[in-house]
Amino acid sequence: MAIPGRQYGLILPKKTQPLHRVLQKPSVFGSDSDDDETSVSESLQREAAKKQAMKQTKLEIQKALAEDSTVYEYDSVYDEMQKKKEENNPKLLPGKDRKPKYIHNLLKAVEIRKKEQEKRMEKKIQREREMENGEFDDKEAFVTSAYKKKLEERAEEEEREKRAAALEAHLDVTKQKDLSGFYRHLLNQAVGEEAAPKSSFREARTVIKEEKLRGYPDETNSESRPPQQSCVLQRGAQEAEENPDADREFDDESSEDGEKRDHKVKSRGEDTGASMKHPKHHKNRAHSRSSSEERGLGTKHHSRGSQSRGHEHQDRQSRDQESCHKDRSHREEKSSHRHREASHKDHYWKKHEQEDKLKGREQEERQDREGKREKYSSREQERDRQRNDHDRYSEKEKKRKEKEEHTKARRERCEDSGKHREREKPEGHGQSSERHRDRRESSPRSRPKDDLDQERSSKARNTEKDKGEQGKPSHSETSLATKHRLAEERPEKGSEQERPPEAVSKFAKRSNEETVMSARDRYLARQMARINAKTYIEKEDD
């Protein structure tokens, strides 16, 4: 059971119902004058309340103004607030104050291109004048003031570019032997004596810093320098020769000492050669002036400064001596190391050259040997060919002569045997033999037997001839004998040829002069006839 007086959940206030005014019913016997009196009194009360409220507000305004006179300056306060907002937020600034991001770089690039184009045109005009070869030298050349100004500006720009190139060469770390100048500039930038270089290359080209020489108050003139500092001077001169950037420092001009620096620049312009040759002497003069100015400040400050300067001077002398000894030892080590490297390199290159020479000689010798071998082999091959050809030719000649002699001897024997048979055999017997031969030739069975008989007879004759040749005299004697026989037989043949020739058939019996020879003898005879008819010699295959 919940307690009746308490509520749970979201409690919302109830809307108060407007009170309905209870209208009095007008009485029949009432009069209108009573209503007029009530309305007048109410209006008077309202006016009195208004006047009282006005007086109250005036009093409050006076009190507030007495406390703070700027209480009711709303517009000025609002304007100040808006200005602060605009200052804090740069995006809300008007467009006139905003600067473009990229157009100034583009304009610089356009100017550079214009100047380059002008230089090109000048070179082109110069070439055209050279091509003319002085045709128009007698005529006047008009030069305007604007062109003169342009030439002056161009000369100034060329000087600036030369300075920028020299500055870049001095600041280039790759061209320096050590990093002393780089670390000195880095230290000056960290301390604040030198402004850090800008990243933009074009800004670095246009904005070129002037080179300033900084002096130290503890240094004295070069004439009054003690003999102990000669080592320091030598080291400084060597560093200036080796590293031109080591003794150069760049400082930004300040508003306080602007006049002094202008005076120094003028004096430097008068004595440029002396300052370039002896930069430390120039430093000493500048620092002697500064020390003379400082002397007039006070005796106490002077005494303290002189004591501190003396200590610093001694420390610096000791440091300079130590650094001089270190530099000497370092240079000696460097020179010895370089000498060793150079000797090592020379030895290495000499070794390589000797090896290359040896290799080249070996290659030449090999090539000569190979060439000689090739020549010798080619010559030997030619000689062998000539010998083989000569041997073959001689062998062929021998074979041919032997065959000729063999055939001649065979013919002679055949002729002798034929004559002897003609004498012995009668004519009848010759006719029967001829018939018998014709029958043999006509019958096909008897042909192979006849061939076999002929071959056997030819073989037997050959063997007899070989035996007879062994027992016979030499070829020259046989040739003479054969010549005599042929001479004797010629008249007999001539008498036989005088007789009228008879029609001889194809298969007729041959005469005794045309003796039958074997197939092999006929073949050899044909071959010999062909060989004798040829004017050249055939090469036989191996």
Curated annotation (Swiss-Prot):
Subunit-structure text = Interacts (via C-terminus) with SRSF1. Interacts (via C-terminus) with SRSF2.
Q: Which stretches does UniProt call biased (Basic and acidic residues)?
A: 200-217, 257-271, 309-335, 343-475, 485-501
Q: Which domain of life is it from?
A: Eukaryota
Q: Where along the chain is composition biased (Basic residues)? A: 277-288
Q: Which residues cross the membrane?
A: none
Coiled-coil blocks: 103-172, 372-413
The protein's name: Nuclear speckle splicing regulatory protein 1
Q: What cellular component GO annotations does this protein have?
A: nuclear speck; nucleus; ribonucleoprotein complex
Q: Where is the composition biased (Polar residues)?
A: 223-232
Tell whether Magnesium is among the UniProt keywords: no
Glycyl lysine isopeptide (Lys-Gly) (interchain with G-Cter in SUMO2) crosslink: positions? 198, 209, 280
Gene Ontology molecular functions: mRNA binding
Name its cellular compartments.
Answer: Nucleus; Nucleus speckle
Looking at the record, which segments are called Disordered? 21-53, 190-516
Species of provenance: Mus musculus
Q: Which family does it belong to?
A: Belongs to the NSRP1 family.
Residues bearing N6-acetyllysine are: 277
Q: Which GO terms describe its biological process?
A: developmental process; in utero embryonic development; mRNA processing; regulation of alternative mRNA splicing, via spliceosome; RNA splicing
Question: Which residues are recorded with the post-translational modification Phosphoserine?
Answer: 27, 31, 33, 254-255, 443
* Disruption outcome: Mice show early embryonic lethality shortly after implantation.
Q: Which UniProt keywords apply?
A: Acetylation, Coiled coil, Isopeptide bond, mRNA processing, mRNA splicing, Nucleus, Phosphoprotein, RNA-binding, Ubl conjugation
Query: Looking at the record, which segments are called Necessary for alternative splicing activity?
Result: 105-169
As for what it does, the entry says: RNA-binding protein that mediates pre-mRNA alternative splicing regulation.
Query: Where in the sequence does UniProt note compositional bias of the Acidic residues kind?
Result: 239-256
